[in-house]
């Protein structure tokens, strides 16, 4: 194999909706799926708890999360990078 090994870990992009916990953020990931019968695109969403070691991400930030080993009962994702900072109005 001369090619570089690809990462088998899943990555998702979502929006931080809560950063109140210590070293943890709640990330809302939205997916558009086509309804099997009617053909309309519907938004499906799910929340993930992700590890934020430095407490540097705040509500409204778009972040990329990567699947990891279980860190706690509900946390098995780690924030890998900031995609877009929250807009200040």
Curated annotation (Swiss-Prot):
GO terms for cellular component: cytosolic small ribosomal subunit. The keyword Transmembrane does not apply. It comes from the Bacteria. Gene3D superfamilies: Nucleic acid-binding proteins. Keywords: Ribonucleoprotein, Ribosomal protein, RNA-binding, rRNA-binding. InterPro entries: NA-bd_OB-fold, Ribosomal_uS17, Ribosomal_uS17_bact/chlr, Ribosomal_uS17_CS. The keyword Ligase does not apply. GO terms for biological process: translation. GO terms for molecular function: rRNA binding; structural constituent of ribosome. It holds the Pfam family Ribosomal_S17. One of the primary rRNA binding proteins, it binds specifically to the 5'-end of 16S ribosomal RNA. HAMAP family: Ribosomal_uS17_B (MF_01345_B). Belongs to the universal ribosomal protein uS17 family. PANTHER family: 40S RIBOSOMAL PROTEIN S11 FAMILY MEMBER, SMALL RIBOSOMAL SUBUNIT PROTEIN US17M. Part of the 30S ribosomal subunit. This is Small ribosomal subunit protein uS17. The lineage of its organism: Bacteria, Pseudomonadati, Pseudomonadota, Betaproteobacteria, Burkholderiales.
